């Protein structure tokens, strides 16, 4: 099982954690939402929960809960800039499609 970050995502997360001044890393998860069924969740982590799995890539700890791991295995978190827009992009090999608005995905 693995979760990875692109170089641009690692730099961005590192900057966010440095600006925040504390934190173990970044939690990556999924929740039920949207028209396709699931949406990604990103949040800072200060403490680990029972059942969390910790991945480390490019010096950044990515924490995933046990229920989300099956949907996220093999995912690469990227940070992209497209014109005036910028944001995190999830390159998830388990995703079989997204809704039209791009807010949710299915497997």
From Swiss-Prot:
PROSITE patterns: HESB. GO terms for biological process: iron-sulfur cluster assembly. Coiled coil: none annotated. Gene3D superfamilies: HesB-like domain. Keywords: Iron, Metal-binding. Disulfide bonds: none annotated. One of its GO terms (cellular component) is cytosol. It comes from the Bacteria. One of its GO terms (molecular function) is iron ion binding. Its cofactor is Fe cation. Fe cation binds at residues 35, 99, 101. Binds 2 iron ions per dimer. The dimer may bind additional iron ions. Belongs to the HesB/IscA family. Homodimer; may form tetramers and higher multimers. Is able to transfer iron-sulfur clusters to apo-ferredoxin. Multiple cycles of [2Fe2S] cluster formation and transfer are observed, suggesting that IscA acts catalytically. Recruits intracellular free iron so as to provide iron for the assembly of transient iron-sulfur cluster in IscU in the presence of IscS, L-cysteine and the thioredoxin reductase system TrxA/TrxB. This is Iron-binding protein IscA. It comes from Pectobacterium carotovorum subsp. carotovorum (strain PC1).
């Amino acid at each position: 099982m693995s979760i990875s970050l692109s170089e641009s995502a690692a730099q961005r997360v590192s900057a966010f954690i440095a600006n925040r001044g504390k934190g173990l890393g970044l939690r990556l998860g999924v929740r039920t939402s949207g028209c396709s069924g699931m949406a990604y969740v990103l949040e800072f982590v200060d403490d680990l929960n029972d059942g969390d799995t910790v991945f480390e890539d490019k010096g950044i700890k990515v924490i995933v809960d046990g229920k989300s791991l099956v949907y996220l295995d093999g995912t690469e978190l990227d940070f992209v800039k497209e014109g005036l827009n910028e944001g995190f992009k999830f390159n998830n090999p388990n995703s079989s499609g997204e809704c039209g608005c791009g807010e949710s995905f299915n497997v």
